[in-house]
Each structure stands twice: as C-alpha cells, then as structure tokens.
C-alpha cells in the first residue's frame, strides 16, 4: 500500500530530525536549550503532527460521473406503452385504463427508455434479456466514465454495484470484474434490495472503504433492471411501478488521492442516512410480494407520501445542524423554546435550505413525491427543475436518478466553484438519505456536455409538465 503524500512528508521530517540529533547540530549553549530537551521537544512535535495526519479524515473527491443513455430504438412513448400493455394480453381493460390515468398524470414524457424485450408484442422477458439489459447499462456507463476520466479500469481498487431487484449469480460486480479483467485483489461489493436510495448508501460505503484504503479509486455503479421487474398482474397497488420506472444507470468515480483534487468536480462534505424500518408502516409501504394470484410485484402503499415526509423530517433533523447557518439555528432554538418549554401553539419550523444549498437533486420518484417535497421545504419551481425534467426525460431510473439530475444542472452550466449540491434520496425500508457535495471548480460549457445524457436534448428544457 502506498504511503499518502502527507504521511510521507511527516516521516521525512522525523528522519531529518533524527539525522540532526545524530550530528548534534541542534546544540545550544544556553542551559534551557540544551540538546536533550530540544531533541525531546522536537520529537514530540513530530509525533503529534504524524498522529494528526494519520487520524484526521481524508477528503473524498468526486472525480467525475457518467449516466447511460440508451439508443433511440429503446424509446417508449405513452402510445407504445399502451400498445405493449395490450399486446401482452395480461391486463384487463380496467387495468389498462388505470395505467393510462397514472401515466398521463405521472410527469413522464415520450422519450424515456424501456428494455428491448418489453417493446416486442408480446413482451419476452427472460434471464438472458435481463443480463443483456444490465450489460448495456452498466458497461455503457462505465465505458463513458473511464473515457471521461482517463483512468484505466485496473487502476480502480474498489467497485460497488447497487441494483435492488435483479440479483443474478455470478453477481453484477463479478460481471464487471470479468469484463474489464480487473486485478485479483480488487474489492467488490454488490448491494441488493436497498431500493431507490441505494446510490446514496453506496457513496457512504465507498467513503468508509476509502478511509481504510489510502491512495485509491472507488467506482460506484447505480442501476435497476426493468426486464424481470414488470408486474404482470392486475392488482392496482402493484401497477404504479410499471408506469413510472424506466431503464437507466450511472457510474461514479470517487478518489481519496490528494493529487486528484485539482481535476475533481466535487468534494464530499456530508452524508446523513435515516432508516425507519423499525416501524411496520414504514417497512411495508413499498414491498415486493405476491398478489392474490401468486404474481410477484412491488406494492406501493397509499401512505407512501406520508411515510416519505416523516422520514425526511427525521433526516433533516440530523442534517440541519451540519449545514444551516447560525441564523437558522437560532430560529430553530426559538421554535423549540416556544413549542416545548412554553407550550405555545406555533407554526412548524421549516428551515430555509436555500441559504446553504445552491442546487437540489431530489430523487425523481414520481410527481406526487416531488410536489410534496417542494411544498414541505418551501422550494421553488426552479429548485425542483432538475428533478422534474429528469422525470420527464428519463422517468424514474431508481437510484441513478440523482446523477441524471446533477448531469442536468451541469448541462445547464449552473455549477460554479463553491456551490453546494444536495442530493436527497428516498427508498424502500423506509430510508431517506442526504449527500452534500461542494463544487471544487466551475464546470465550463465545453466540458458540461461531454458524455452527458442531456447533450442532445437539454436545449429543449425546461418544459411545462401538465
């Protein structure tokens, strides 16, 4: 394992001091500065700085990221979706009418993407097609990432893949090892069943692994597989995912190497994770199970928005003290004094997060969820633009939606040095996770569209979503 640059400097300092001791060049004539106490003092100072450099938290940099953009042949318009549903001969007329209403109010446009096997009549989902979808998305995102960064796959020491519903054997992380012929000591992780918030969980895992592995690159792949996830029954609680979820995936390059700071786009400042799974209502609000006829699907509770709001409140309680300015903290203390100490009836305290965040990347889970977050946090239509436009252009791409949203912000040339970005993810369990990044440099126009999935369409956005 390589020695970090800061550690190397401290070790070099100690070696120089030892050499000086041996040469007796630190001799002073005054009794107070006699050689022995001077040597001991300098040695203690060196030990202190060495201990500080080895125990302090090393920065984690986001070198770059890339989102997969499928080919036009995989685009699925509303009309194509309805034709597919009818051609499958699985759904009743009432079910098709219900999905029609959901899709028309979903906020999705006609340029989202579907697996190729779902565009045939009838659809032909299979394990082979599921693997094909994952290979296209994962390798497409990774190839773009390696091209953008100039980093070879074998230089990466840590790979983390998160895909909630598709868990083949060998794993998706092993598929990457095989494709890129990675080194035998590469550390790989495969996260499943973590829902749409798994991308944030992967960032947290990568951050902790980078603390234990200096001078290392970590790559995160966030995706979901649609081929085997389509619900083929008529239970209304399980039909909404059919209408909202689409093909997508992202690859993210993280580094703890000090020399990467200059070229990296962002530095990680905070991760706050909230898990409300101890509550049955939260645990079962988004659950994969069988319907009354034994058909597997993901059932969404009518309480989903309420559960998400409660989880968000808990998450913000932990995040607020880390990011809010002093003025907002004082207002919060005043609210607590009035409501708790004096039992006064006061309006709920809602922090102004626009004071500490420039860009908002809220998980594009659905129109209702985005509306609730916008209203609950007092955000503007402009603040929610990246999320709503991502939902319109790409649909709900699960854990990778946060990166399509950040790609939108970059494509609009809005990222300036020092800006803070808030990525907010929701997922089954129920989980609510926040990631805060600080932009290390301004993203110029000639770089913002390179390998960006918005490159061919950002000029059309924003659009009005009815």
UniProtKB/Swiss-Prot annotation:
| Expression tissues | Expressed in siliques and flowers.
Identify which residues the record assigns to the active site: 196, 275, 359, 363, 392, 396
* EC category: transferase
Give me the gene this protein comes from.
Answer: HIC
User: Predominant location of this chain?
Assistant: membrane
**Annotated metabolic or biological route of this protein:** Lipid metabolism; fatty acid biosynthesis
The record's Gene Ontology biological-process terms are: fatty acid biosynthetic process
Induction field: Repressed by herbicides such as flufenacet and benfuresate.
What protein name applies here? 3-ketoacyl-CoA synthase 13
